Amino acid sequence: MKADAKTEAAVLAAMNKFTAAYQQRDIEGLMGILSPDEDIFLFGTGIDEKRTGPDEFRFQAERDWAQTETLAFSLAWHKISAAGSVAWVAAEGLGKGKAGGQEFEFPMRMTAVLEQRGDKWLLAQFQISLPAPGQEEGNSVPV
């Protein structure tokens, strides 16, 4: 169900806090937005990026930062739904960064599940993906 305005604003604020901490390479700020539970989960864009638990999430963020000079995400569109203390987000936007002295940008898609604990919304599951290269608009598969 569509989130009410108060929930949508709180969840969007949590997502913005997450992207700001990531862009600023603030590991403690980033970890403070995650659920502390060992079953939090992340799918990244790399073939090996399947992470479970806070320690693996931390490892992934630190690896991302070690391989880039800058890396940021901006969300251009989002849809937020909720039921009780659980909210789920679908969003798309643009990733931008610099690695090896070369600037890059890419369209990205993201889904997330957040849980409200007290007055905070915490990320429990997160997935980021890239539209399939070579798949033209209107086609269901990239061939």
Each model region followed by its residue ranges:
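Short beta-strand edge/turn micro-motifs at domain boundaries
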Residues: W88, E105-E137
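Residue-level preference for beta-strand/loop junctions
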Residues: E69-A72, S85, V89, F106
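Residue-level signal for tight coil/turn positions that link beta-strands
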Residues: W77, G84-V86, G118
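Short, cysteine-centered beta-strand-loop-beta hairpins and adjacent loop/turn segments enriched
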Residues: Q67-T68, K96-F104
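Short, low-complexity N-terminal intrinsically disordered segments enriched in polar/charged residues
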Residues: M1-P36, V141-V143
